[in-house]
A protein has these predicted regions:
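Fe-S-dependent hydro-lyases/dehydratases of central metabolism
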Residues: 1-129
Length: 129
């Protein structure tokens, strides 16, 4: 991780210390961040946390920090969810796809453990089976 904006900080509470990336610290240099909708601040924190100079670049953070709701979007940004929550209607086909890919890897003599989601995923079954 790059942390080119120097936003990584710590918080101590209850005897534990955690690290996080402060959107408020970024706002000191880029005050327009304070006017972003909350949902975009969450996305901005995600970019700060994953800035690596390759997939998430400094320019990506600045593009979102300077977001103008009236402007036509001209840049895609990366999003790295901490986890994915899937309802059974969409989750079951994804699990079936993963199983099929693992079977295909085994049939080709490969290691099925190489086929895994990049983000943790939870499958919620919202009815009785």
């Amino acid at each position: 991780m790059n942390d080119s904006f120097k936003t990584k900080t710590t918080l101590s509470a209850g005897g534990a210390t955690v690290s996080f990336f402060s959107v408020e610290t970024l706002a000191k240099e880029h005050p327009e961040v304070r006017t972003l909708p909350y949902s975009l601040k969450v996305l901005l924190e995600n970019l700060l946390r994953h800035e690596d100079g390759r997939v998430v670049k400094r320019e990506d953070v600045l593009a979102l920090a300077k977001w103008d709701p009236k402007a036509e979007p001209d840049k895609e940004i990366a999003f790295h969810p901490a986890r994915v929550l899937m309802q059974d209607f969409t989750g079951v086909p994804a699990v079936v796809d993963l199983a099929a890919m693992r079977e295909a890897i085994v049939a080709m003599g490969g290691d099925p453990a190489r086929v895994n989601p990049l983000s943790p995923a939870d499958l919620v079954i919202d009815h009785s089976v």
